Amino acid sequence: TSIVQRAEVSQRRINELLDQKTDLLSEENIESTLAGALEVNHLSFVYPDSGVQALRDISFSIAAGQTLGIIGTTGSGKSTLANLLMRMYDASTGEILVDGRPIQQYSLASLRSQIGVVPQDVFLFSDTIANNIAFGLDQPNLDRITQAAKDADVYQNILDFPKGFETLLGERGITLSGGQKQRVSIARAIVKEPKILILDDCLSAVDTKTENAILNSLQKIMKNRTSIIISHRVSSAKLADQIIVLDEGRIVERGDHGSLMEQKGVYAALFEKQTQGGESVEESAH
């Protein structure tokens, strides 16, 4: 029947994906618990397929538990840097050290299990809210799911739905607002209690008021956890201990919010433009 034929084609495609071998090999398969210190030395990256150079001679370090803001416009190399920190690719030149060890020495599964990522485009399954948050846990744990929802400031929203955590999302269920989606995505990233948290321009789709509310709840989540806030909005990165400004794959400025404003360069210009352009940067987020 046509359904069986369609299923066969789908299975073939899935098998092709499952049979693919990764080029990323772990040199020593280290599986230690991370503290979260990161050091990037003279990192450059060229995309192998297109030959486009996305990053040029990037260097910075973050102590365990600190927050780094990475600011830049579209195409500046922000997300490429996030992908390298998750070891989706290996650097063309230079190195990334995690807790003083080259990133290649860690077991990929162990490394990635300790990194929580909130992507720009949230993908939620047609499943319950609980299962969407629990995605990434080996065993669903209601206490951890509940705590993650509270930390992401979406717990009360969930309780307001008729079936609470068992509420279905997607085609057969309800549709969440942009802010609720992002909060569920944040809960999903932190439910596995990662040592490193990467926010990849994840607040670009929400309005400023929602952004400030989410940033306030993120402050608690980021405390004592190495966090990287990637954004084109200055308001998202204001909280960071250290901020780097990327332009065409290079670091053009670095400092904290105050010192970067005093430099009156790219960062300050972006801040002024975004503040005047209606993307108000409220002090409440500080």
Task: Please place each PLM-identified region on the residue numbering.
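Cytosolic ends of transmembrane helices, especially the final helix of ABC transmembrane type-1 domains
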Residues: 1-17
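Signal-transduction coiled-coil helices of two-component systems
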Residues: 4, 21-24
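Coiled-coil segment of the histidine kinase dimerization/signal-transmission module
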Residues: 17-20, 135
